[in-house]
Amino acid sequence: MRKRRPYVIVYVTSSVDGKIASRTGDSRLSCPHDLRRLHEVRASCDAVVVGANTVIRDDPSLTVRYVRGSNPIRVVIDGMLRSPLNAKLFTDGQARTVVYTSVLSPRGKVNELRKRGVDVYVLEPMNSSGTLSLTKVLEHLYEVVGARKVLVEGGGTLLWYFFKERLVDEVRITVSPYVIGGEEAISVVEGEGFSSREEWVKLRLKNVKLCECGNEVHIIYEVVRKRMIRELP
């Protein structure tokens, strides 16, 4: 029997060449209007999900600031618990924070986060690198945490695993008028990638909007499931 999971939205802002940050980690791509759009989506979701690299690189708060609305549950997927203890998510007390990690993570760090009121769930990893099954994470988010709609903001490695496990329902991407370039720059989706067209994740266009700034484009896609592919022209 297939277990239930939340509806998953991916929201990213990228350069024209598909990068979300430069090789030095500079990710300042969004205009004020795009930030407002992001926060509107954030406010509409029960939880917002990021990976360890985003916590380490950006130290985000993941709260709702540019629009009115409640803060979502902040979820960190960090199989080896590499996120620093002084990260805003663990210290600012702005919203509930949930961490999914593996049995390979330092026990002392798990205990310290729990003392601070962070909900830490320890799962069995899929490999020695601490990679977690996102399918199991989403099932837990639905059944135990109570999240029905979640927003995944990255980074590129986490997005790869979400797409690899076929867990994304909707993709929202803002294309910003920059070219970043570089093999070491961070792409929208990192990871090993799919090897053939049969494996690619197919999308269906739902909406295209010129940003109010006049220089960015916001695109909304829905992910096409196998049963839907036969219906497409």
What kind of feature is each model-predicted range?
Residues 1-233:
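Enzymes that bind and transform nitrogen-containing heteroaromatic metabolites
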